[in-house]
Amino acid sequence: MPPNNLKSIGAAEMKQSLFGSALSYEDIIDSPFTWTQQTIVGPEDMDGTPCQILESKPGKGHTSSYSSVKSWIDSRRLVPLRIEKYDSSGKVVRRINTTRVLLEGGDSLPVDLKVYGPGGSVTHITGSRLKRGVSYADTDFTPEGFKLLNAPPGSGSSE
């Protein structure tokens, strides 16, 4: 059951850890694939899989704590196999590796991720219960909607 206390997240908190994971709030909310500056910088194999490296930079008027993001895109399945997020000095701040890809209805989906964050933190994310075609209403993402959430069966959370 979700907690009864709610906290707004401001710009200053966007770099903070999301629920103690190696991801930040910004990693969940902002997609570098939507940034205006996109450049293919070359090919590289990832574990024997041919990839194209896409470099993304936030355009004018877009605020991000990352100066650039590089994504290794599987050329055949069009799935990011690695994402590296860089600070303004060019240092990798966060690396996300796709460890399992699922073929679902003709689409390839990254379902298991390993996230390497600041300070050596590592988080494994599994999409073993991933469902497609699920619809959500805007009200599901309100404070009232979050109070109605139930933990998935078998998640270990009390219901």
Descriptions of predicted regions:
Residues F33-G42:
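Surface-exposed, charged, gly/pro-rich loop-and-adjacent secondary-structure segments at domain edges
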Residues A137-E159:
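Gram-negative outer-membrane assembly/targeting C-terminal domains
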Residues M1-P2, D27-T34, K57-G59, F146, ...:
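Mature-chain termini and adjacent capping regions
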Residues K7, Q16, S24-S31, D45-T142:
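Gly/Pro-enriched, hydrophobic low-complexity segments
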Residues M1-G20:
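Hydrophobic alpha-helical segments and helix pairs
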